[in-house]
Amino acid sequence: MVAEAEVMHQPVPVLEVPYHRCVAKGVEEVAAAAAVAPPPVVEVEVAVQVPHMGLESAAGAPSISVDALQFVPSIRSGSFADIGPRRYMEDEHIRIDDLSAHLGSLLVCPLPSAFYGVFDGHGGLDAAAYMKRHAMRFLFEDSEFPQASQVDETYVQSVENSVRRAFLQADLALADDLDISRSSGTTALTALVFGRQLLVANAGDCRAVLCRRGVAMEMSRDHRANYAEECERVAASGGYIEDGYLNGVLSVTRALGDWDMKMPDGSISPLIAEPEFRQTMLTEDDEFLIMGCDGIWDVMTSQHAVSIVRRGLRQHDDPERCARELVMEAKRLETADNLTVIVVCFVSELGSPRQEQVGGQAGVARPRSCKSLSAEALCNLRSWLETDR
């Protein structure tokens, strides 16, 4: 049980066995191999189930092993953006690996702490650029943003409430800023890490994908017309879907800005800025998080993206290079949009490839074993080799 956190509220200023292998060719080599062979070793991977909380209740979540509770994420990240085939670049992103250091001593939060955001603009760059400049202010200058050194349910819920307020306040600010076109809007995908907790908030069709032992775990849902629950909400609020577009105009059903499509503040609107949340407690099984705009996901699956990044980390261990490789793959697959990717690593290194597909299950480690020869087996092998001669 995690110690209860003391939650305070304070305004915060923003700163920007090696294993032995031998092929015997003769009796002498067999004897030599037996003499230096290590004792029998069998490596077994034990799966750890982690509660996946967010829109669903955390009640009844499976327990977590002691080893999992001792895990501390080792955070590092890389990003890459490309204009793609478009004439203008409308994406923006934020990448802060050490949030506590970035905000200074006035913010008390569980460590390690980090913040990331991807903003995919439409109708011009205005809205996305505004979010890049002001997202930190909306989030962390909130007087009700919780401050605590430990994570408990109260703290997590308070952080979620603060992020929700930040999305909605930013949306209203876009309406009030006379320098921003009312037809300009942006999707918003953010990820907060505090301690071992990962909290993802999403409004729009950017996507966050967690790699858990090689398996893609989607940490957000695309707010598009093919999302059944969104279609129901749109219809209930007086909107409609035509040819895959909200009111025949916009490809997403949630976004910040786009005030030419929204009703006045307080009125029900088919297009909303309300984010959806997903959260999980990170363990040693959670290797990295991919955050990308829809230009990535239009041409590849979440699992494909995870496989590319995982292979890259094993080869060169550079998250920024992995982000670039993912963007280049999307261009090779002829994406039609701008491209932005952030790769956030939670472990210091992946090491050599050990997790292979076993019995149709990706991400399950293949057991390895090392064997030594008994004296009797050695004699039998010697006799067999001599007879074979």
Swiss-Prot record:
Protein name per Swiss-Prot or TrEMBL: Probable protein phosphatase 2C 47
Domain of life: Eukaryota
One GO MF term: protein serine/threonine phosphatase activity
Residues of the PPM-type phosphatase domain: 76-346
Signal peptide annotation: none
Cofactor: Mg(2+); Mn(2+)
Cofactor-binding details, from the entry: Binds 2 magnesium or manganese ions per subunit.
Gene3D superfamilies in the cross-refs: PPM-type phosphatase domain
EC number from the UniProt entry: 3.1.3.16
Keywords for this protein: Hydrolase, Magnesium, Manganese, Metal-binding, Protein phosphatase
Catalyzed reactions: O-phospho-L-seryl-[protein] + H2O = L-seryl-[protein] + phosphate; O-phospho-L-threonyl-[protein] + H2O = L-threonyl-[protein] + phosphate
Binding residue positions for Mn(2+) 1: 120-121
Enzyme class of the recorded protein, top EC level: hydrolase
One of the GO BP terms on file: signal transduction
PANTHER family hit by this protein: PROTEIN PHOSPHATASE 2C, PROTEIN PHOSPHATASE 2C 49-RELATED
Amino acids binding Mn(2+) 2: 120, 294, 337
Family according to the record: Belongs to the PP2C family.
